């Protein structure tokens, strides 16, 4: 009996340790709730930033994500922020897995974490009805260019080339 308990305890501790290692090895998306837009905006103020809204439930988004991964590999200086803006909050593990498959694991990642997603969209842009994908090109001076739908990455590259280089 004692041997069974010790074995069960060892197996349990092994599973806990393995799960802990997995969590430490993979960055989870930051929960995007009320006030997150203001925080994200202030953290990137004064720095050219590409903010890409996508979703696990958006077919064109999933097809497009590997292209963003290639662009990030090509332009490691690009400040890319990804926001999973699904109407219903998605599992952080599913979001993370999709980003890893697309080569975007090193990009800053957020995920809508409020079931009242209309409120989150309104904080971002009162005129945005929630269509995905959507990309915002935010210049150092705060001026913003919105690219609705699948982004033309040639346009994004051209915009990046026109931005002043700044330290991360």
Task: Name each model-derived stretch.
Residues 1-9:
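Bacterial N-terminal signal peptides that target proteins for export
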Residues 8-16:
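Bacterial N-terminal signal peptides
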Residues 19-23:
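Sec/Tat signal peptide C-region and signal peptidase I cleavage site
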Residues 27-49:
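A short beta-strand-turn-helix
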Residues 52-58, 85:
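Aromatic-flanked redox-active Cys/Sec active sites in thiol-based oxidoreductases
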Residues 63-102, 117-120:
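Structural microenvironment flanking redox-active thiols in thiol-disulfide oxidoreductases
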Residues 99-132:
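Short, internal strand/loop/helix patches
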Residues 131-168:
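Thiol-/selenol-based redox modules, centered on thioredoxin-like
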